[in-house]
Amino acid sequence: MANILRKTKLYFKTPDTKLSYNISSIMQGVLMDKVSYGFGEKMHQNGIKPYSQYFSYEDDVPVWTINTLNEEAESELVQPLLDEGCQKIYLRQKNLTLEILKKEHQEVSYDALMQDTFFSSCSRYITLKFKTPTSFKTNNQYQFYPTTEHILKSLVNKFNACGFDAELDYFEDMEEALQHMQIVNYSLHSTQFYLEHTKIPSFMGRITLKIAGPQQFVNLMHLLIHIGEYAGIGIKTAMGMGAVEITERKEK
């Protein structure tokens, strides 16, 4: 069966209470309330989850985005939300009901992504917008600014967790791969993501990566980063962190 990446957006009527991206952890609870026991048990285990989700605003309209990386996650998490009978979302912890104005659903196959990136001729520059607080964890310490090493390792781990029928031979020597990557521009600020009673130090903003090396490596990085739009980058992407949007620019 072909791997399909899916993105679902629920647009809500603006509530009287102003909401922020921190509501994402509560939205995660909404998702898990609907799943089967077996799937729920798997999701409570450590490891990369086959989905990401986050809360944001588009033109002042509240939007909940859920990305799924395999068929099981799509069936368990998203299909109940796409049902015609699902017109509202109730947030028990907030005693708040969000009225759904519209739903959008799009999908792309791994094969199509490969054609658009790996078998294409991509730019050596790519800009990432970190839409929600992003952080990494190394040696039990939070890393709340981006480095090429943390970004690349996160993308490779999430790619491998997707179960794609492919091997990333380029990354057998991570140090060599990192020599081809450089952050050449950034506009970032530090922030915190509130998760229950914990404040996770994190960052938001934009960076521009310059990718050197063979064109095939450039294309492969574009493939990984495009998958990052669905999988997220960094830690706790199933809880609302690490949402990424991509803006490419032509090589100068």
Where are these regions (language model features)?
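RNA-interacting cores
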Residues: 1-252
